[in-house]
């Protein structure tokens, strides 16, 4: 069963340590990030999410970002990304 982690509303540099800890604590299985409440996505947290996606894929574990908020989608667009860029490759 996949672990589900609800992302903080503000994913700025102040939230990076907490996000890193949440990701590290979930590294042993499939992971879904609940992005419904994200109001701001900063570069450092985006890097952590993209890195986690790659790590989960390398481990052949499922990784998903579920229901990104409109604000998160807007922030992704500013980085030249779409929500699909956060999708994991493993099943």
Question: What are the residue ranges of the model-derived segments?
Answer:
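STAS-like cytosolic regulatory interaction modules
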Residues: 1-44, 48-91
């Amino acid at each position: 069963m996949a672990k589900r982690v609800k992302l903080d509303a503000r994913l700025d540099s102040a939230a990076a340590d907490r996000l890193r800890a949440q990701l590290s604590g979930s590294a042993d299985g499939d992971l879904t990030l609940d992005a419904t409440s994200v109001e701001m996505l900063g570069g450092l947290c985006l890097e952590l999410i993209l890195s986690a996606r790659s790590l989960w894929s390398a481990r052949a574990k499922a990784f998903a970002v579920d229901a990104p908020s409109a604000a998160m989608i807007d922030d992704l667009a500013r980085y030249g990304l779409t929500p699909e860029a956060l999708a994991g490759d493993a099943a």
